[in-house]
Amino acid sequence: MSNVPTELKYASSHEWVRSEGNGVYTVGITEHAQELLGDMVFVDLPEVGRTVAAGEDCAVAESVKAASDIYAPISGEIVAVNGELESSPELVNSGPYAEGFLFQIKASDEGELAKLLDATAYQASIDE
């Protein structure tokens, strides 16, 4: 069974969101998603300064099995990306909720967080 931290919010497309304060949120893919994808070989991250809408594809995770679009779980401006993934994409596998995060976003509408799933609802969605 995948690890689903209770303090995070989740998109049905397998991204997680963690508040860092001041309207900034860290985003990554869930342990379940990285298990399905397998070993990461490349991660294409969005450009810092790019404005994205909730549900917009903004990154790509390429594994030995497939390439998968990563969607912005909330709208806002990309304020930072995880540069470590350029040389070490496997961090997405080894630490999906920590050093394997993808990017940080400054939310333009924090009300969108209410549309995301809590840990219980996300776990139920992947158990179906």
From Swiss-Prot:
Boundaries of every Lipoyl-binding domain copy: 24-106
Binding note for cofactor: Binds 1 lipoyl cofactor covalently.
Modified positions (N6-lipoyllysine) in chain numbering: 65
Record keywords: Lipoyl
GO cellular component: cytosol; glycine cleavage complex
Biological processes per GO annotation: glycine decarboxylation via glycine cleavage system
Cross-referenced Pfam families: GCV_H
Cofactor(s) this protein cannot do without: (R)-lipoate
Gene3D superfamilies assigned: 2.40.50.100
Function: The glycine cleavage system catalyzes the degradation of glycine. The H protein shuttles the methylamine group of glycine from the P protein to the T protein.
Assembly, per entry: The glycine cleavage system is composed of four proteins: P, T, L and H.
Protein family per UniProt: Belongs to the GcvH family.
Name of the protein: Glycine cleavage system H protein
Species, as recorded: Serratia proteamaculans (strain 568)
